[in-house]
Amino acid sequence: MATMNAVVYHGRGDVRFEKVTVPECGEGELRVKIDACAVCGSDQKTFLNGNPRMKPPIAMGHEFSGLIDTVGKSVRGFSAGDRVVMATSISCGECFYCRKGWSNLCVKLDPMGFSYPGGMAEYVIIPEIAIRNGHVVKVPEGIKPEHAALAEPVSCAVNAAENCRITEGDTVVVVGAGPLGVMNLFVAREYGAAKLILAQREGKRLDLAKGFDCDRLVNTTKENLVEVVRAETGGVGADVVIVAAPEAAVQEQSIDLARKKGRICLFASLP
């Protein structure tokens, strides 16, 4: 029986790079040969703290891209060689929220890398329910695999921009200059934000942030963020505040950063 390499979660603090059996493609499934898979913050948290949603042993990884290797006999609309990505939290398609079109709120979400083997492997099986419910997306030609693999986290930033109703002329504050904070920064600009304020405490991420497209970079170790935002907005406050740092104090501070009737997104997970 053929084997492949995979990063397998066995429990809290126990993640192994090991050989597993290459999965076979069922009639209603797709098998994808993975060529890029990102590491999400939730993967790190799972390793450090465990995760009750995980069903070990299981291959990790939900931010992936790859080429379809095998198409199940009953699958239509996909061909071998197509590059695909996924909305990897698979909805049931039947609950109250799914019927309303709010599949992200599905009461039976089964994510790749949690409920189904994920993309930190040479091959992954995309289950029939994911195909049926529209979770598989073809990638246009010319996009690099490592860029395509970021479609899932970028879609989260797009969701934040849409829920915060970012429009042309807005002043947007992003707190936290990690990968997701920077993605939110770029997406906010694409949605028309006129002024972008990026805040990060002193350290490596602050140094890296100096190369990104923001109008004001705030070192929160040395500067008072609330005072800076007030000064940059004529004392009014920001139209939108996106907190991409899982810290209670920063999340509480967001209220002081936003103007009256402003919009706040607690993008990062709670502490």
Which residues fall in each region the model found?
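Short N-terminal strand-loop motif that marks the start
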Residues: 1-65, 124-126, 130-133
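Glycine-rich beta-strand-centered segment in the early N-terminal region that forms part
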Residues: 23-37, 51-96, 137-142
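Structural detector of well-ordered beta-strand residues that form the stable sheet scaffold
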Residues: 65, 85, 173, 197, ...
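Mid-domain Rossmann-like dinucleotide-binding core that forms the NAD(H)/NADP(H) cofactor-binding site
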Residues: 83, 141-223, 227
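Receiver (REC) domain switch-region micro-motif
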Residues: 84, 172, 237-241
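NAD(P)H dinucleotide-binding glycine-rich loop of Rossmann-like/cofactor-binding domains
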Residues: 92-175
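Glycine-rich cofactor phosphate-binding loops and adjacent beta1-alpha1 units
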Residues: 164, 207, 212-271
